[in-house]
């Protein structure tokens, strides 16, 4: 995965060098590390549900604000690889998470309002996460490149909570946050995103009747990411145990989760568009 990340950045860097003389310094001066433009759009068009455990998106509102959305994406595209590589890991992650989420909204708008699911943007031969249409770091990247090639690359960030930060425009996905990710608050933001998702009983819960833990399919797909030792956690069961108070109500059930003596079932994933209804 490290080699994959280097390949992505080197490929992007080759293209970046061609235009570095003309736009690199300007991009360095103009880039807003607070991602204020993205926060403004999110605060306008993200609706919190269930006490902030989930969210829906006003895609119609984003469609009306397509120009500022594209301007924000253009600002991200203007950042040269050399500038990005000089940032802190937190600043890099915030940049990539915001780029992923804003690009996903833009992708939805290409077919909205006819679209009922992001999966409709794919085909039998390709998923919507594969095309390399996103201008970033001097090259063309796909959503998969950003998430799996950069954010999830082994030995780089090793941050499993990325799964609670990137949003796939679907009801089953962890919520689209109502503000941009920013470097100076990233640990707190990721902690809150995790708490929100784990407390949402529609997607993660202890089933008292069946005496088993029922988790989002995300943990089935990416369970290995929770074995890397982040915050001392080296197993999915240990991660669940750390969130026992959000997954269960009864003290006995919470104690069982913390003991690790339980089975896990994964819930079906809802790919319906997370549009405001």
Model-predicted segments: where are they?
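Interaction/scaffold regions that mediate signaling and macromolecular assembly across diverse proteins
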Residues: 30-86, 90-94, 104-277
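N-terminal export signals
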Residues: 7-26
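Surface-exposed, glycine/proline- and aromatic-rich loop segments on solvent-exposed faces
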Residues: 97
């Amino acid at each position: 995965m490290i080699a994959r990340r280097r390949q992505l950045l080197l490929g992007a860097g080759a293209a970046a060098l061609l235009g570095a003389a003309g736009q690199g310094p300007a991009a360095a001066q103009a880039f807003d590390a607070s991602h204020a433009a993205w926060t403004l759009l999110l605060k306008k068009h993200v609706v919190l549900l269930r006490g902030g455990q989930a969210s829906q998106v006003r895609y119609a509102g984003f469609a009306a604000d397509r120009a500022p959305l594209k301007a924000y994406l253009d600002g991200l595209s203007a950042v040269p690889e050399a500038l990005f590589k000089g940032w802190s890991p937190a600043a890099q992650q915030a940049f990539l998470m915001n780029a992923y989420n804003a690009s996903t909204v833009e992708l939805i708008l290409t077919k909205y309002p006819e679209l009922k699911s992001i999966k409709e943007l794919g085909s039998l031969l390709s998923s919507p996460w594969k095309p390399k249409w996103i201008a970033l770091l001097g090259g063309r990247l796909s959503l998969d490149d950003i998430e799996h090639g950069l954010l999830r690359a082994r030995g780089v960030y090793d941050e499993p909570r990325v799964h609670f930060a990137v949003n796939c425009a679907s009801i089953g996905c962890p919520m689209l946050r109502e503000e941009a990710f920013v470097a100076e608050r990233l640990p707190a933001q990721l902690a809150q995103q995790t708490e929100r998702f784990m407390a949402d009983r529609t997607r993660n819960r202890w089933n008292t009747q069946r005496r088993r833990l029922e988790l989002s399919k995300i943990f089935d797909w990416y369970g290995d990411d929770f074995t890397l030792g982040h915050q001392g956690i080296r197993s999915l069961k240990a991660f669940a145990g750390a969130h026992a108070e959000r997954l269960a109500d009864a003290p006995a059930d919470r104690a069982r989760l913390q003991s690790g003596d339980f089975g896990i079932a994964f819930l079906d994933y809802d790919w319906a568009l997370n549009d405001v209804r």
